């Protein structure tokens, strides 16, 4: 499923095409099948994207009410999916104001909905990009994250 999300993100978002301008879901499914993806994985990926859009538009309490200086305690399931490096990176992004609390929670929600048992740091970065791209008012954060990803120098974790 993650491969499909990456394919869509790279072919539509990175090429500045509006995902909403896709002709229809059936045509997209056909395109993805022609690209070699399995139908079950295609459906999972499209559902994942739909849930991301729902999060953006929802009034979920965990997305609306938070203490300004609260500390995130991860559940055992979240810690299994997000290793120490990934959790540290999320904290780093919050500290430099790339992620706010709401965006962080959206990222964690989307990570937990992936059918991957664990994620690499690079996978997490792509999920963050997808969330920031889809979240209203996060254009500057998206640009910062994009710059961090594509301007990284080998051997340097942070600039």
UniProtKB/Swiss-Prot annotation:
Belongs to the Smg family. This is Protein Smg homolog. The lineage of its organism: Bacteria, Pseudomonadati, Pseudomonadota, Gammaproteobacteria, Alteromonadales. The gene is smg.
């Amino acid at each position: 499923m993650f491969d499909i999300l990456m394919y869509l993100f790279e072919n539509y978002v990175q090429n500045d095409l509006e995902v909403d301008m896709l002709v229809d879901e059936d045509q997209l499914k056909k395109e993805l099948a022609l690209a070699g993806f399995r139908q079950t994985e295609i459906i999972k990926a499209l559902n994942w994207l739909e849930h991301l859009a729902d999060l953006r538009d929802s009034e979920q309490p965990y997305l609306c009410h938070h203490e300004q200086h609260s500390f995130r305690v991860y559940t055992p399931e979240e810690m299994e999916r997000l290793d120490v490096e990934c959790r540290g990176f999320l904290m780093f992004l919050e500290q430099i104001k790339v992620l706010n609390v709401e965006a962080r929670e959206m990222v964690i929600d989307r990570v937990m909905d992936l059918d991957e048992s664990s994620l690499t740091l690079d996978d997490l970065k792509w999920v963050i990009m997808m969330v920031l791209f889809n979240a209203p008012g996060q254009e500057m954060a998206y640009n910062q994250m994009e710059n961090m990803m594509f301007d990284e120098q080998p051997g340097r974790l942070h600039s």
